[in-house]
Amino acid sequence: MGAVFISGRESAVWLNKHLANDIGSLAIEQAHYSFLLNDGGGVIDDLIIYRLAEDVFFVVPNASGVDAVMAHLIGCIGEADVRLENRSGSVVSIAVQGSMAESLMQSIFPEIGFDRLKKNDLKLVDGKSDSMILARTGYTGSDGFEIFTDIEEGRALWERLLNNNSGVECHVCGLGSRDTLRIEAGYPLYGNELNTSLTPIQAGLGFFVGAELKQTLKEQFPNNLPKVVYFKVLEKAPPPRNGYEIFEGESSIGKVTSGCLSPLTGEGIGFALVNSKISLNESEKYSIFIRNRKYSLMFVKRGIIYS
């Protein structure tokens, strides 16, 4: 993940002009999910904003999006009293996720009352060289925490987590497991469900957009534009993958953007970008083309695994 620090007397007001939702509602030591948008309403990147102090923010973009985010923000500064610092090469991010995450974190940081940290809350603690950020955030759909610190301390923390004596088993997970977890939870991935050509409204994420901007986007873009929707495959089938076609009857209406077999249910699930108005919970209307045959498909509310 990226690590961009934004500070200065006008940082809050300035950020509010460039993000999709209201920074003013964010208390110190709180975080929220947002989008950096281009002039056309498309998503440059999705990111999490952490408010460390009144005029100090920590922005976490995707690792692949750091250059685009920095270029856009630098181009927007003008005369504003704002300072940007890209520390992506020196800040380590460790995501501790799962139902036992709180117990594990409590054993590593006994001085912190993690039971009092609500979702999206954060705590600044003294590290060896700088403040360490402990936040109740993550992108798996489960409870969990993220740790942001310097490389040396991150390496030591990694070993402490894996070799902890709390009785909690801690396993290393890669991006493949993160991908299935976020698909089960109905979370989008930049480059698949989000890009510079799609607005948050099209991506089905309008609830993360401030009311005024949402109205502007709705006025600027017609309802018949392609939309990101969530589906599950109704028959036993190979995993749905990016690029597989979706049909309504004999007509192709879109393609899969992300898909997998759910480890929880064994069903094929995922996201698709469709060009047509669709109906939820219709079991006989839609299909997906996988390995030279069609399988029945239903569009459902996203994140149905956890509903």
Region spans (language model):
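Conserved, structured C-terminal
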Residues: 52-307
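Internal amphipathic helical hairpin motif
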Residues: 9-43, 101-130
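Well-ordered mid-protein domain cores that form the structural environment of catalytic cofactors
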Residues: 22-76
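Short hydrophobic beta-strand that contains or immediately precedes a catalytic carboxylate
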Residues: 6
